[in-house]
Amino acid sequence: MTNFTTYLSTAPVVALIWFTFTAGLLIEINRFFPDPLVFSF
């Protein structure tokens, strides 16, 4: 039972770190290679 409670306490932490990394990666990709939604000629 302690292994299950340890899993419940660490899975949200791992998910938070993963989602933060993914969001930061997408933000940096869009900063250097912006989407062609707005064409500023």
Swiss-Prot record:
BP GO annotations: photosynthesis
Entry membrane topology: Single-pass membrane protein
Primary residence: plastid
InterPro entries in the record: PSI_PsaJ, PSI_PsaJ_sf
Manganese is among the record's keywords: no
GO cellular component, one term: chloroplast thylakoid membrane
This protein's UniProt keywords: Chloroplast, Membrane, Photosynthesis, Photosystem I, Plastid, Thylakoid, Transmembrane, Transmembrane helix
Subcellular localization(s) per the UniProt record: Plastid, Chloroplast thylakoid membrane
Pfam families: PSI_PsaJ
Coiled-coil regions, chain positions: none
Transmembrane segments: 7-27
Family: Belongs to the PsaJ family.
Purpose: May help in the organization of the PsaE and PsaF subunits.
Record protein name field: Photosystem I reaction center subunit IX
Organism: Pleurastrum terricola
The gene coding this protein: psaJ
